């Protein structure tokens, strides 16, 4: 696997800084010309190189990054943000499939990554709506596991079921290291 990791960097994030993709320095239209230039570089290789966007932006703009003339794929973080409820999962899947069609790209599915608590841990905690995604799990993590009761057996079963669902969906699945084992946050 030949790979370079071009990730976003946040130097400082204050309490007043939103992390939902609406900050004016994120998701600027000008970035798409840069990605089109990168695509031209990727296409000079034989075979052409692939790329995936780690774009924590508004869902309706996420698939702009996945166009064939740009990076080609983007992580579907709406799937990762879904709680273990039918409504959340169904909505994330339907939106992901629709957005992929609209951008002429493949659907992608991701349950977690290095920015959020592991899926087994999240699914072991109460599945209640919060004002920010993963708020319950982040609070639990920051309080050293003391803020909410954790049902590890339930979390492991849910995480494995979610992974099987992810792998059954059309498109590409991105499995974060340890997810296939149902590993918890440590």
Predicted segments with their positions:
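Active-site and adjacent substrate-binding regions of carbohydrate-active enzymes
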Residues: 1-186
């Amino acid at each position: 696997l030949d790979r370079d990791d071009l990730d976003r960097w946040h130097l400082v994030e204050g309490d007043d800084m939103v992390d939902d993709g609406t900050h004016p320095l994120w998701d600027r239209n000008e970035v798409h010309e840069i990605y089109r230039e990168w695509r031209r570089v990727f296409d000079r290789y034989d075979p052409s190189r692939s790329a995936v966007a780690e774009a924590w932006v508004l869902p309706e703009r996420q698939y702009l990054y996945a166009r064939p003339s740009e990076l080609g794929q983007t992580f579907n973080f709406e799937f990762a943000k879904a709680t273990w409820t039918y409504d959340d999962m169904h909505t994330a899947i339907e939106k992901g499939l629709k957005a992929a069609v609209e951008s002429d790209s493949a659907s992608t599915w991701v349950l977690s990554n290095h920015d959020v608590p592991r899926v087994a841990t999240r699914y072991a905690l109460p599945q209640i709506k919060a004002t920010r995604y993963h708020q319950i799990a982040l609070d639990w993590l920051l309080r050293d596991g003391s803020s909410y009761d954790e049902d590890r057996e339930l979390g492991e079963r849910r995480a494995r079921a979610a992974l099987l669902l992810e792998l059954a969906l059309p498109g590409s699945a991105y499995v974060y290291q340890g997810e296939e084992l149902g590993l918890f946050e440590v």
